[in-house]
Amino acid sequence: MITQRQNDILNLIVELFTQTHEPVGSKALQRTIESSSATIRNDMAKLEKLGLLEKAHTSSGRMPSPAGFKYFVEHSLRLDSIDEQDIYHVIKAFDFEAFKLEDMLQKASHILSEMTGYTSVILDVEPARQRLTGFDVVQLSNHDALAVMTLDESKPVTVQFAIPRNFLTRDLIAFKAIVEERLLDGSVMDIHYKLRTEIPQIVQKYFVTTDNVLQLFDYVFSELFLETVFVAGKVNSLTYSDLSTYQFLDNEQQVAISLRQGLKEGEMASVQVADSQEAALADVSVLTHKFLIPYRGFGLLSLIGPIDMDYRRSVSLVNIIGKVLAAKLGDYYRYLNSNHYEVH
């Protein structure tokens, strides 16, 4: 453990370095730390010996090491902090007409990326926790049809498919009936399980040839098992990391898995400093924050950036955007669930 004065010195060096990205000397610290320059230098040397500070090659000043940033995050950073100066700018950025859920999630991701200069990722509610609350099949022609699904009574998912060659109209009706009887109102996790267990047995009762029917089930419902991911500022990753991080961000499903793994069960927020199990994120910092999507569950708002980021402001922005987004979503879902009257 370090002393209170050493902790104050480390915190101040982190604050000054993230603002200027210049090594910090004892004279700069003396303006805030009420100790002699010699005492401060001695404490800085001890912090360096502990691996929390690093000596700059071009000056006598010190800068935080990755371990120093991590210590600061774990012992001094408040994950619920908010800087009131950013509230107005975030609210103003959200002043737009949203026509669907995806509009708001994409906008929030862009706002966070633009205000930080880093990479932002937003995830919808985890697929396994969503429920299938509506299903229909619309025949578009003699050869293709559209499966129209509703998740959580509000999120539409459509899948266009070619009607199998041996299908008759009654076969499409049977397909829909099986879904309504066996899968409707179940969670996506239940659907995944039933497609491997119950459905193959049920299909045998309705169809002579079952192979293409089971393939159709897999094709139509595979969309439900995918994460809905919104990435903004991907090219920014090239300024604080290497090409592997940039390429990793192209694999949105793997990005979603890694971000969810970084948040422990029951946690609402976390900050990982060069601590991700994913190799492409091992040398960056990842801030993750859960936000409420009314009536449906929690989404995930993440910021990926350099180890030497301004953590206080980044955490503040993540918190503000999460709160404003949740409020915006609350208005959106209240509107969807209310009676709508045309105004003349």
From Swiss-Prot:
What is an annotated GO biological process for this record, any one?
negative regulation of DNA-templated transcription
The record's section on InterPro entries has: GAF-like_dom_sf (IPR029016), HrcA (IPR002571), HrcA_C (IPR021153), WH-like_DNA-bd_sf (IPR036388), WH_DNA-bd_sf (IPR036390), WHTH_HrcA_DNA-bd (IPR005104), WHTH_transcript_rep_HrcA_IDD (IPR023120)
Nucleus among keywords: no
- Report whether Ribonucleoprotein shows up as a keyword of the record: no
Sorted alphabetically, which keywords does the UniProt record give?
Repressor, Stress response, Transcription, Transcription regulation
Q: Which residues cross the membrane?
A: none
One Gene Ontology MF term: DNA binding
Q: What is the similarity comment for this entry?
A: Belongs to the HrcA family.
What is the stated purpose of this protein?
Answer: Negative regulator of class I heat shock genes (grpE-dnaK-dnaJ and groELS operons). Prevents heat-shock induction of these operons.
Name-wise, this protein is Heat-inducible transcription repressor HrcA
Classification lineage? Bacteria, Bacillati, Bacillota, Bacilli, Lactobacillales
